Swiss-Prot record:
Taxonomic path: Bacteria, Pseudomonadati, Spirochaetota, Spirochaetia, Leptospirales
Polar residues compositional bias, start-end: 136-145
Class of the enzyme per the UniProt entry, highest EC level: ligase
HAMAP family (UniProt xref): GatA (MF_00120)
PANTHER family assigned to the protein according to its UniProt record, in alphabetical order: GLUTAMYL-TRNA(GLN) AMIDOTRANSFERASE SUBUNIT A, TRANSAMIDASE
Lineage: superkingdom: Bacteria
Record GO biological process: translation
Similarity section: Belongs to the amidase family. GatA subfamily.
A GO molecular-function descriptor: ATP binding
Keywords: ATP-binding, Ligase, Nucleotide-binding, Protein biosynthesis
Organism the protein comes from: Leptospira biflexa serovar Patoc (strain Patoc 1 / ATCC 23582 / Paris)
Function: Allows the formation of correctly charged Gln-tRNA(Gln) through the transamidation of misacylated Glu-tRNA(Gln) in organisms which lack glutaminyl-tRNA synthetase. The reaction takes place in the presence of glutamine and ATP through an activated gamma-phospho-Glu-tRNA(Gln).
Name this polypeptide is given: Glutamyl-tRNA(Gln) amidotransferase subunit A
UniProt-annotated catalytic positions: 80 (charge relay system), 155 (charge relay system), 179 (acyl-ester intermediate)
């Protein structure tokens, strides 16, 4: 039974559908694993085992009676704590929403329920998705399964740790500036940020509405493509979803590297760790040997991505988080003073340090006299970044670069220097600003046994090509990673 937790998503799907494995048996194995290792990894904020097992038993009953909802019926999936599920606490790892029970399902949750997935809610995250390590969670810091003294990345660190720690085969996260891809890279798994507008954001608690996107983590490539097909599509409840052809998982095929133009970056322009730099160059050499044409691209605008991202994201967060005022829902601090005192006391007690920092920065950039100098300029720069990506894809088929400049750092190593923490997103934020899709793929281990990831990027709504390249990359010997069985 213990070996079940080390099956890939594809193997689980196959065995459930051929009848050699029951959902209850599988879910029980995962719950046993969670009980054994999550005291170290702290991926879950809460775990209602009775409710989870009930879902698994219902799936098995449907299977026995020939009433399966889909080929995915009975597969377990983890849910980040900022995605609403009816009757479940959705806290965003914040004190201000600690006791908020969602009255409705996010669109992505409705789609998963329609297919019969077994939901494992409440995976830890940085508070309101603001962070790159989960150290900004109001409740706990998640740990990296490859080394529990290190961070798993963020903000979707709990979602990544759950999959990398073999507590689940797949999970959902959200990506505003790299919050799926960076933890996927640091935890040695697959993580996709779809094109903005591909997946509905209805029911995702907003951080920065023009940047946020829900996406999947998986322990193999098929989990990514299957989940993208299930989650994508136009939604009347989210006017930013786009009318495009429905993505189909079965249409994803490996792509021959021969004569394909791969956009690459000059590593000397960025402060990569030696191991990340060496692995990136090694992969490029391997692809060149398979006939790919390497095309150096001018990433000069990338140096502006971090300031542009933090001006736009914090401005939107300042607006979005103004709804948490202690009146309608969330933490309420009773005062004997005026209404303004209630707002101030509730927000001061409910929000963490990093969230307050970003609200203040966003409010400042939107204020009279500074709007044009900061927010207005950032929006103009965003247009330039978007245009630069459009130019890139006129000459290359795909862009390949490291996902993160370094492997996972130790817990507490960067908490005193927020700027250093922000720089961890230098390779991911521009993708959100441009709205294009990108996937982080495992790319082997460094000298300390820590995962390295590389990021593939294609043009808007070209996920078929993106996942085709990712599938081909997954076959390279140099990119193989075995997830840890023992958590140390």
């Amino acid at each position: 039974m213990k070996d079940l937790i080390f099956l890939t998503y594809s193997e689980i799907k196959k065995r459930l559908n051929e009848g050699s494995l029951s959902s209850e048996e599988l879910v029980s194995a995962y719950l046993e694993r969670i009980n054994a290792v999550d005291s170290k990894l702290k991926a879950f904020l809460e775990l209602n085992q009775e409710k989870i097992l009930k879902q698994a038993k219902e799936s098995d009953d449907r299977r026995k009676n020939g009433k399966l909802l889909s080929e995915f019926d009975g597969i377990p999936i983890g849910i980040k704590d900022n995605i609403c599920i009816t009757g479940e606490v959705t806290s965003c790892s914040s004190k201000i929403l600690e006791n908020f029970v969602s009255p409705y399902d996010a669109t992505v949750i409705s789609k998963l329920k329609e297919k019969g997935f077994v939901l494992f809610p409440r995976l830890n995250m940085d508070e309101f998705a603001m962070g790159s390590s989960t150290e900004n969670s109001a409740f706990q810091t998640s740990k990296n399964p490859f080394d529990s003294d290190r961070i798993p990345g963020g903000s979707s660190g709990g979602s990544a740790a759950a999959v990398a720690g073999s507590m689940l085969p797949i999970s959902l996260g959200s990506d505003t500036g790299g919050s799926i891809r960076q933890p996927a890279s640091l935890c040695g798994i697959w993580g996709l940020k779809p094109t903005y507008g591909r997946v509905s954001r209805y029911g995702l608690v907003a951080y920065a509405s023009s940047l946020d996107q829900i996406g999947p983590f998986s322990n193999d490539m098929d989990g990514i493509s299957d989940l993208l097909e299930i989650l994508s599509g136009i939604d009347s409840k989210d006017q930013t979803t786009s009318k495009v052809n429905q993505f189909e998982s079965k249409s994803v095929n490996e792509i021959d590297w021969k004569c394909k133009k791969i956009g690459i970056m000059k590593t000397e322009d960025f402060n990569f760790s030696p191991d990340v730099n060496a692995r990136y160059l090694e992969i490029l050499k391997t692809l060149e040997g398979k006939g790919a044409e390497l095309v150096p691209l001018d990433f000069s605008l990338l140096k502006y991505a971090i300031p542009v991202y933090y001006l736009i994201a914090t401005a939107e967060c300042s607006s979005n988080l103004s709804r948490f005022d202690g009146i309608r829902y969330g933490l309420r601090k009773e005062t004997s003073g005026k209404l303004d005192d209630l707002y101030s006391e509730s927000r001061s007690a409910g929000f963490g340090k990093e969230v307050k920092r970003r609200i203040l920065l966003g409010t400042f950039s939107l204020s009279s006299g500074y709007y044009d100098a900061y927010y207005g300029k950032a929006q103009k720069a965003r247009v330039l970044i978007r245009k630069q990506y459009a130019e890139f894809f006129k000459t290359v088929d795909v862009i390949l670069q490291p996902t993160s400049p370094t492997t996972a750092f130790k817990v507490g190593e960067k908490t005193k220097d927020p700027i250093q923490m922000y720089q961890a997103d230098i390779l991911t934020t521009s993708v959100n600003l441009a709205g294009v899709p990108a996937i982080s793929c495992p790319a082997g281990l460094d000298q300390n046994g820590l995962p390295i990831g590389v990021q593939l990027t294609t043009s808007h709504f070209d996920e078929n090509k993106l996942l085709g390249f990712a599938k081909s990359l997954s076959k390279l010997d140099i990119c193989q990673i075995s997830l840890p069985k023992e958590i140390k």
